[in-house]
């Protein structure tokens, strides 16, 4: 049975509170500020009646133990009436301080909640299996980091304000109205032009900070998208910590910009209210003037009318909070479902510094989740340390699937096993297994950083400039790097957009060269390149394959003629195997593919 909406909301709310409770000091301050705000609103309306009725009474009265003899109208005790503006200013100042405390604290809670949830979601992405990232829409993944988390914080803040402050205000005003009896009459409150000046200044500040927030948000989105696009490389090269730190920096910058906006909001609102209090104070002061005596109205009427007007906005807020709260709950549900997604299975405990590189597929069959047709069927081959096996075949035949299984990007074999140095790859820890493998694919992922840092990305520890230079030289990348104005320090742009395809490929080869892993996977590393680039890259790949166990997936058969063994894959099965010469002589499927490419 599915949980009822009420139970689901309760569960989500309790889980959301686990993010807020570490900041319970700020939460307490915000609630106290909201309570004081609501009480001051009610108290101010309550003071209107005694100020008017007692101050303007025809007969002597006693207020707070002080006798107020009056001769009628405006000639009543002027000391009391002169004190009224000071009381009003004091109350509104207290109200402004309470509003500042509550608004700033809630903004702090919201900004910290956004930052914490975004960081948690981002780091969870780094632990998710490739299968999850492949089947999800990248836009939805980014939206959960950027939009959903912000919706949660916004809804939480709005709900807290309405439930505490507006509820107390409404209850207080209703109590006053029922206490004084029901009356309704005119109401006009004119706010001076000074408020317009303040609003104009603050609006300009809001616009400026909003632009900065949009820029910071762009950094968050770009970093997230970059990680998602390069998810395999991040996992393969163990770059989770690097990506987490990179995201923390842009995430924290976004939080800082939001706090600048919060400060402007927190200051502007009490300033406007204090200015308004001076306007009201002037009205009360003017009431003590002789010319205003005959225009005075009853205190009860003024108090009830004031209570009615003061109650309108809180009621509107309370009617809106449910819709806002529901949007927040929906966003919470989406984010929590993501966080509840199981990370990559990492039950293996086998650790090794460096394997020999003996790789074996032992009658492996595999199907993708939800697919009835197997992607691989009874795949059986053996690669000795330092040898090269090439996989050829039409697109969709299962070649890249085999590469994904070696790195455990996909798991769940239907039968058989994959062994590395006679140990099942599922017995290795993920970190240990992937540290033995270097991956170079057709779709090169470069990060928005320098060439040197992109090459060093694959290295597990500190790397020297000399090591980077050596790797770039062996990859034949220095040929173009030396022509760049800043050499290795040249920024490559987002995903290497400032470099050509061949240049990006050579940086990827240098990255794998620096990693110095005993097992190498080349997945279409030279496809879709011009002849000149292919020659330079092929030289780099030849250096890279030296003394490494290599799995080469290729469409261009000229690049794998020297392989120790060539496997022809068709519909998930090995239909031919042998050396280039033997397969040509056999005149089978491989010879047919070769004939198609070279017409020989």
From Swiss-Prot:
Residues 359-596 form the ABC transporter domain. Its EC number is 7.5.2.6. Pfam families: ABC_membrane (PF00664), ABC_tran (PF00005). Keywords: ATP-binding, Cell inner membrane, Cell membrane, Lipid transport, Membrane, Nucleotide-binding, Translocase, Transmembrane, Transmembrane helix, Transport. The keyword Phosphoprotein does not apply. ATP binds at residues 393-400. SMART domains: AAA. Signal peptide: none annotated. It catalyses: ATP + H2O + lipid A-core oligosaccharideSide 1 = ADP + phosphate + lipid A-core oligosaccharideSide 2. CDD domains: ABC_6TM_MsbA_like. Residues 29-327 form the ABC transmembrane type-1 domain. One of its GO terms (cellular component) is plasma membrane. It is found in: Cell inner membrane. PROSITE patterns: ABC_TM1F, ABC_TRANSPORTER_1, ABC_TRANSPORTER_2, MSBA. It is an enzyme of class 7 (translocase). The keyword Nuclease does not apply. GO terms for molecular function: ABC-type oligopeptide transporter activity; ATP binding; ATP hydrolysis activity; ATPase-coupled lipid transmembrane transporter activity. Belongs to the ABC transporter superfamily. Lipid exporter (TC 3.A.1.106) family. Homodimer. Involved in lipopolysaccharide (LPS) biosynthesis. Translocates lipid A-core from the inner to the outer leaflet of the inner membrane. Transmembrane domains (TMD) form a pore in the inner membrane and the ATP-binding domain (NBD) is responsible for energy generation. In MsbA the ATP-binding domain (NBD) and the transmembrane domain (TMD) are fused. This is ATP-dependent lipid A-core flippase.
């Amino acid at each position: 049975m599915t949980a009822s909406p009420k139970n689901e909301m309760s569960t989500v709310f309790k889980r959301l509170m686990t993010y807020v409770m570490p900041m319970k000091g700020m939460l307490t301050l915000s609630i106290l500020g909201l309570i004081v705000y609501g009480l001051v609103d009610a108290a101010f309306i309550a003071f209107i009646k005694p100020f008017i009725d007692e101050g303007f009474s025809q007969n002597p009265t006693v207020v707070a133990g002080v006798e107020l003899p009056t001769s009628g109208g405006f000639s009543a005790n002027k000391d009391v009436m002169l004190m009224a503006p000071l009381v009003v200013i004091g109350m509104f100042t207290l109200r402004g301080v309470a509003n500042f405390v509550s608004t700033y604290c809630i903004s702090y809670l919201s900004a910290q909640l956004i930052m914490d949830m975004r960081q948690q979601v981002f780091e969870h992405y780094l632990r998710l299996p490739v299968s999850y990232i492949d089947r999800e829409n990248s836009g939805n993944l980014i939206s959960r980091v950027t939009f959903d988390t912000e919706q949660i914080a916004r809804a939480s803040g709005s709900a807290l304000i309405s439930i505490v402050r507006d509820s107390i205000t409404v209850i207080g005003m209703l109590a006053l109205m029922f206490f004084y009896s029901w009356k309704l009459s005119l109401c006009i409150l004119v706010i001076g032009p000074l408020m317009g000046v303040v609003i104009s200044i603050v609006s300009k500040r809001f616009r400026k900070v909003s632009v900065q927030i949009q820029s910071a948000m762009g950094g968050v989105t770009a970093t997230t998208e970059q990680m998602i696009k390069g998810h395999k490389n991040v996992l393969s090269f163990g770059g989770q910590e690097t990506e987490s730190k990179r995201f923390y920096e842009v995430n924290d910058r976004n939080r800082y910009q939001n706090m600048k906006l919060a400060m402007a909001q927190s200051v502007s609102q009490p300033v406007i209210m204090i200015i308004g209090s001076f306007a009201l104070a002037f009205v009360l002061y003017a009431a003590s003037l002789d010319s205003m005596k005959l225009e005075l109205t009853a205190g009860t009427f003024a108090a009830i009318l004031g209570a009615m007007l003061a109650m309108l906005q809180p009621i509107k807020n309370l009617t809106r909070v449910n819709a806002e709260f529901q949007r927040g709950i929906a966003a919470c549900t989406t984010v929590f479902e993501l966080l509840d997604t199981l990370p990559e299975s990492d039950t293996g405990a086998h650790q090794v510094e460096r394997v020999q590189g003996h790789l074996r597929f032992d009658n492996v069959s595999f199907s993708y989740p939800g697919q009835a047709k197997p992607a691989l069927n009874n795949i059986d081959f053996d690669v000795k340390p330092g040898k090269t096996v090439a996989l050829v075949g039409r697109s969709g035949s299962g070649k890249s699937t085999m590469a994904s299984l070696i790195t455990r990007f996909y798991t769940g074999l239907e039968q058989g096993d994959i062994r590395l140095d006679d140990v099942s790859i599922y017995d290795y820890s993920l970190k240990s297994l992937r540290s033995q493998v270097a991956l170079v694919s057709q779709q090169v992922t470069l990060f928005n950083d320098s060439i040197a840092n992109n090459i060093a990305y694959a290295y597990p520890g500190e790397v020297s400039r000399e090591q980077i230079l050596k790797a770039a030289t062996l990859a034949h990348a220095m040929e173009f790097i030396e022509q760049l104005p800043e050499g290795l320090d040249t920024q490559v742009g987002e995903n290497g957009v400032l470099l050509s395809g061949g240049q990006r490929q050579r940086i990827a080869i240098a990255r794998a060269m620096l990693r110095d892993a005993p097992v190498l996977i080349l997945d279409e590393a030279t496809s879709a390149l011009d002849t000149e680039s292919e020659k330079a890259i092929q030289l780099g790949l030849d250096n890279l394959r030296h003394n490494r166990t290599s799995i080469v997936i290729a469409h261009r058969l000229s690049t794998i003629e020297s392989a120790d063994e060539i496997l022809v894959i068709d519909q998930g099965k090995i239909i031919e195997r042998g050396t280039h010469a033997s397969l040509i002589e056999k005149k089978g499927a491989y010879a047919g593919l070769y004939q198609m490419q070279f017409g020989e």
